[in-house]
């Protein structure tokens, strides 16, 4: 074997894109920024940083782990607190992701859609299954959904969208065990159906589109966009979304 790329942390979902003939992956970002450097990282920053990463991986690239993490707000790599005084002058030399995704959501599978059953906008786009966070306290856990990223010639052509929701079956996830199901894997059937698997009970869902594809457009996506207000999907408010202390929960 040969070294293809380096500086990659905890990749679970990896996929070859036949349209671009390139390798792509979704990366789990690091944890515990507040625990390692409480003077410079608040508990809120610990919950929303760093990004999970959607990557196009080319031969010879270095993505900076463990020396850096990706800050989705600054849209740049940042030197990790453990290495601030280790002689690393800049994080600019490291490769960037195609997109930064919400922190700690645990992207566990990646699939590029090749079928024709869904409306045309989904062709060659990326589906990502988020297993869900375990350590965003004192804020609600996040993820537990499947998202879609529209793609054009191997690059994102829009923001990520909620594609499949309802796996957790609760509105506020205090801890991982509260979620009934956790999306884990993705597969495309011969007819273009999308299959989503769960890691807790081994359940599998089949997703099909049975309406008129030619009439599908932005209006059909509005209701899905509203889902981003749910506590396990939206960015937590620093004050309003603080969870009660364990000893006050009855």
Language-model features: locations:
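Beta-propeller domain segments
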Residues: 9-10, 15-177, 181, 207-243
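Conserved loop/turn motif of beta-propeller repeat scaffolds
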Residues: 20, 191-192
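Loop/turn residues immediately N-terminal
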Residues: 30, 201-202
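C-terminal amphipathic alpha-helical "assembly" element
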Residues: 186, 193-195, 204-207, 211
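Short, solvent-exposed mixed-charge patches
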Residues: 246-250
